[in-house]
Amino acid sequence: MGGFLTGTTDIFYWALMIFAIGQIKILQYKFKNLGKHALALMDKSKMSSDEAVNHCMKKCIILHQIIINYVTDVDDLMKPLMLMDFAICSMLISVVGIQVIVSGFGIAQVSSLQYLSSIMGQLFLFYWHANEIILESLDVSIAIWEGQVYSYPLNVQKSLQFVMLRAQKPLTLNVGPFYAMSTTTALSVLQAAYSYVALMRQAYS
């Protein structure tokens, strides 16, 4: 029962993260094709070129702000869970490592390693999706530039420059108040755990 609840909770959180990644990709597409969308809007309405571009830009900026608020809300929701998972995973790595050092490798350690590998796989899925959110949010500014921002009216260019500046600050999901989740920090966690186990091995040898 506990495993089922844990699995469904994890899937729910992964879905929240994948949704954020998808929305950022949609935003990139809209920024990259801002001129095309403005032309399509001009064909459907009586707007001038400048009005159409300005209208499409405002919709993109609103979507960007919605995504920022959404990721912030998801981060607030996940922070305690990620902190708890980090603590459990770190403790398990240390315990299993010490067991192997003190008692040798046996059946008990095999089951512990199996559980540990599932916990680590779970954590890496969280860290990988969080890393994708970081990378995709940074790519928003690239998408704006690829949309030929310099060809738009001056007021639109200035507004898009502010968006590009905001996009330089990546959207992150964090482990409690400590650090942002990414593949780099995931490897750092493993390195720290390995260092602790290596230290314990030295102490027991």
Annotate each predicted stretch with a short phrase.
Residues 1-205:
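Membrane-embedded alpha-helical segments and the immediately adjacent membrane-proximal loops
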